Amino acid sequence: MHRYNAFDEEFVRVRNEQFRDQVKRRLSGGLTEDEFKPLRLMNGVYLQLHAYMLRVAIPYGTLSSRQLHKLADIADRFDKGYGHFTTRQNIQFNWPRLIDIPDILDALAEVNMHAIQTSGNTIRNVTADHLAGAAADEIEDPRPYAELIRQWSTDHPEFQFLPRKFKIAVTGAPVDRAVIRAHDIGLELLPVEGALGVKVWVGGGLGRTPILGEVRHQGLP
């Protein structure tokens, strides 16, 4: 699990300050909903029929006890006492008030969490096998590789305005618990010529038109 360094802390602090100002402008009428939409989506905020929803990133599905306690506290203080874990290992709060969301983001930052790139047409949360690090059939722990991809793709300028959202998953076991074939790119860690390599699946997806990805590379060293 990645722990924030000074750069991470400052980066998230500035992002949260910017969004706090954007929320104030929206509530005061300084921004229309159309103007506010791309700004809120960059911070994981959706507009539902009756309320806003905040989706929080849980990189490769790994939470510490401290982070889980913080999520429970946020649910009690700002929502209805519960959250909704998603298929791709995030958590959603479905009833926060817009005015409270900047405070929620600040609370998340206290435990090295944020909601960046959990919505919008960008590279989304990188997921992995939920038994990573503990599975008996694991060839390699996929979490360090998922973390490298997460760091590389977060706030990358080339990935902020993609045609559609883009999803990546990594597994290190022969049993596909990470459902890598249902992702735009699925990476399977495996032995290749006596060393660690990767099998690459591409073109998968769920949603309205689910499709299984196809193998692009059988084993890259």
Where are these regions (language model features)?
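Charge-rich, low-complexity segments
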Residues: M1-M42
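N-terminal start-of-domain structural block
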Residues: M1-N5, G81, P221
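Conserved histidines in hydrophobic membrane contexts and catalytic metal-binding motifs
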Residues: V198-W201
